[in-house]
C-alpha cells in the first residue's frame, strides 16, 4: 500500500557517484602534473590544471600550497573540500607550513560561508585512511560542511538522501565572488 511509504525525493545527480562515474574525466590532462601526483586523483587534477579550469572542476580558491573545491556530492549546500596540493595521505607527511595554510583556509571559509550563505554552524571532518571512511584515501582533505537549524541533515542518516537547495554552478559563482 502506497500510504505506508514515504514521499520520494529524487536526487538524480547522485547516480554518477553511485556508479563511480568521474564526470571530470572529460577534462584534459594537465600539461604538468605536480611531483608525486596520482593521475587518477581528482584533487591532484584540480591542483595541476590551470586556473582557467577552476569553474569546470569547482575550485573556489587556491593558495601556493592548498586548494578549496566544491564537493560534487555535497552533504549540504556549500560543502567544501580543503586539500593540500601534494598527494599525501597522512598528517605526518605534510609540512608544517602546509598544515597552517590548510587550517587558515578552514577559518577563512567558515567566515565566508557564514557571510555568504548565512551558515550558523559547521561540521569539519578529516577521514584518514580507507577504514576511516576516506573516499580518496591517498590525498587527505578536510570536509567543511555548513549547517543551519532544520537543515534536514537527518535525511542522510535515515534515508540516504540529501536535500541541496542550490545548483553547484550557481554556488561556485556565489563563492568565487566572496573572495
Where are these regions (language model features)?
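C-terminal helix-cap and adjacent tail motif
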Residues: 1-5, 9-22, 147-179
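Active-site microenvironments that recognize anionic phosphate/pyrophosphate groups
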Residues: 1-77
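Divalent metal-coordination and catalytic microenvironments
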Residues: 41, 68, 84, 102, ...
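Histidine- and/or cysteine-centered catalytic micro-motif in compact active-site loops
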Residues: 46, 71-73, 85-87, 127-129
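Histidine-centered divalent-metal-coordination microenvironment in nucleic-acid enzymes
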Residues: 79-84, 129-154
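Short histidine-centered catalytic/ligand-binding loop motif
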Residues: 80-104, 157-164
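Long, well-ordered alpha-helical scaffolding segments within enzyme catalytic domains
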Residues: 94-119, 169-176
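A short glycine-rich, hydrophobically flanked beta-strand micro-motif that places a catalytic Asp/Glu
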Residues: 117-132
Amino acid at each position: 500500500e502506497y500510504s505506508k511509504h514515504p514521499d520520494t525525493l529524487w536526487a538524480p545527480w547522485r547516480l554518477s557517484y553511485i556508479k563511480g562515474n568521474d564526470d571530470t574525466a572529460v577534462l584534459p590532462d594537465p600539461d604538468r602534473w605536480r611531483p608525486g601526483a596520482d593521475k587518477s586523483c581528482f584533487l591532484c587534477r584540480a591542483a595541476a590544471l590551470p586556473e582557467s579550469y577552476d569553474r569546470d572542476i569547482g575550485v573556489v580558491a587556491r593558495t601556493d600550497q592548498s586548494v578549496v573545491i566544491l564537493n560534487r556530492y555535497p552533504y549540504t549546500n556549500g560543502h567544501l573540500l580543503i586539500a593540500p596540493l601534494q598527494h599525501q595521505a597522512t598528517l605526518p607527511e605534510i609540512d608544517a607550513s602546509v598544515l597552517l595554510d590548510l587550517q587558515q583556509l578552514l577559518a577563512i571559509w567558515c567566515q565566508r560561508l557564514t557571510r555568504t550563505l548565512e551558515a550558523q554552524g559547521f561540521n569539519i571532518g578529516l577521514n584518514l585512511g580507507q577504514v576511516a571512511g576516506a573516499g580518496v584515501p591517498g590525498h587527505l582533505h578536510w570536509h567543511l560542511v555548513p549547517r543551519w537549524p532544520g537543515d534536514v541533515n537527518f535525511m542522510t542518516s535515515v534515508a540516504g538522501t540529501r536535500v541541496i537547495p542550490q545548483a553547484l554552478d550557481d554556488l561556485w559563482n556565489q563563492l568565487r565572488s566572496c573572495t
